[in-house]
């Protein structure tokens, strides 16, 4: 399959020789590695009740999966409720799938298996609207699938959803690298605006999103998946860059994601939130603006105007 979106992919691309170097020449571990690696996200059990109430709120399910209600509609991002083949889940999903209220809208940022989990998708509400970047529609196999290019928008009820750029890449199989698009989403609703970055490296797209999309109330940003840095820098931000992205976006609140659910990279499991909190304190940002939620923890979405 042709690499249709090769020119948009993050550079430099990492290939088999880079992976071999990563796996055969690991970097030395810090003295506190074991202590940080033993940490796991906290767990709460109020998420299903909060989502069913109809009030605007967000619940971290785990990894890049959030369930949030805005404009009366239940939105799920990058749904994965189970494990990845060969990679067990470290914490259970924040809301059991059987307890999740009917879903209205599913946003998938790209085709990597930890973001587009087809077994989960096939168990979600069949009548939901699925929004995906260009080329990903045929994989979803649902009736209501909408493909978007960067900066294109689609309206579902009172919500306006725009696909925005990210610095990443796509590959479902070795022969279809960059054959489908990737991105993040800006969701505008009556109560405020949510941004979900998907996977992304650092870049000037954060400032461009702020300029073109206006105020963002809740920025869902990845904070894990960054080590070793020489390998991951072109594709994943680290906790410090997540803080910089928050500032570049001009967002009001940062909702952490993409950590503590799977062991996919080399940093200790509990290191990402520790580093982000340290960066936050160093830059004297208001502590209440940083949301490192427990899995299953509901948080009200109430925008300040």
Language-model features, listed with the residues they occupy:
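Metallo-beta-lactamase
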Residues: 1-85, 93-99, 129-196, 217-224, 275-297, 301-303, ...
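Short beta->alpha connector loops
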Residues: 62-64, 112-114, 136, 167-168, ...
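Catalytic core of the metallo-beta-lactamase
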Residues: 67-69, 155-217, 233-240
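Acidic/histidine-rich helix-loop elements
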Residues: 79-94, 170-175, 227-236
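Active-site metal-binding motif and surrounding structural segment of the metallo-beta-lactamase
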Residues: 85-132, 214-220
């Amino acid at each position: 399959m042709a690499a249709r979106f090769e020119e948009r992919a993050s550079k430099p691309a990492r290939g088999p020789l880079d992976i071999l170097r990563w796996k055969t020449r690991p970097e030395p571990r810090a003295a506190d590695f074991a202590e940080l690696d033993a940490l796991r996200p906290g767990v709460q059990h109020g998420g299903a009740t909060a989502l069913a109430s109809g009030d605007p709120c967000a619940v971290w399910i785990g990894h890049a999966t959030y369930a949030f209600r805005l404009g009366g509609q239940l939105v799920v991002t990058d749904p994965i409720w189970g494990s990845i083949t060969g990679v067990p889940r470290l914490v259970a999903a924040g809301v059991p799938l059987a307890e999740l209220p009917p879903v209205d809208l599913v946003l998938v940022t790209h085709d990597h298996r930890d973001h587009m989990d087809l077994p989960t998708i096939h168990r979600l509400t069949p009548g939901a609207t699925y929004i995906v970047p260009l080329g990903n529609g045929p994989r979803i196999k649902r009736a209501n699938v909408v493909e978007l290019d960067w900066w294109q928008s689609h309206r579902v009820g009172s919500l306006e959803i725009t696909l925005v750029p990210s610095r990443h890449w796509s590959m479902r199989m070795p022969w279809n690298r960059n054959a489908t698009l990737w991105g993040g989403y800006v969701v505008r609703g009556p109560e405020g605006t949510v941004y979900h970055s998907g996977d992304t490296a650092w870049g000037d797209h954060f400032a461009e999103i702020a300029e073109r999309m206006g105020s963002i109330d809740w920025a869902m940003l990845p904070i894990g998946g960054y080590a070793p840095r020489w390998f991951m820098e072109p594709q994943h931000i680290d906790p410090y860059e997540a803080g910089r992205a928050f500032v570049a976006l001009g967002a009001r609140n940062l909702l952490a994601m993409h950590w503590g659910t799977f062991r996919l990279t080399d940093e200790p499991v509990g290191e990402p939130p520790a580093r982000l909190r340290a960066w936050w304190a160093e830059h004297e940002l208001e502590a209440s603006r940083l949301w490192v939620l427990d899995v299953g923890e509901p948080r009200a979405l109430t925008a300040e105007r």
